Amino acid sequence: MGSLRPFRWSKSDRMKQVGTHLVVDAWQAPEDLLNDPEGIRRALIDAISAGEATLIDLCVHQFSPHGVTATATLAESHIAIHTWPEHGYFAADLFFCGSGKPEVAMKVLQTALKAKQVRWREIPRGFDETSQVNERVGEPIYETVL
């Protein structure tokens, strides 16, 4: 198997983009909001609607003594959120394909959970249209993002 090596799309690549992936860190949010599974469920439903996505399934889990994880399966892909109320922090992952608006959905989550600080990375998801299907078999291309 090949070694891990960074991969970045270059301007010369002809990427067929199939979606947009936001990887989010948010902090300075109130502990009570981040530990409220029903509030997080409502925030996700509002975010999905605002992002013009279609909800298929929603799973929310309350951890003990604190923390919530919620995953929403969308017709357009998914949203996942994990909270650490004791740190006023949540991590979210929004992957939308098609015409959905993940940035709008993220802003709704930020507002609903009252995070004062948010940082996200937008990653276009897709493949090189010029590559042969088996061109890179056995040679994984990964990027470790720190």
Task: State each model region's role.
Residues G2-L146:
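Polybasic/polar functional segments that serve as interface/processing modules
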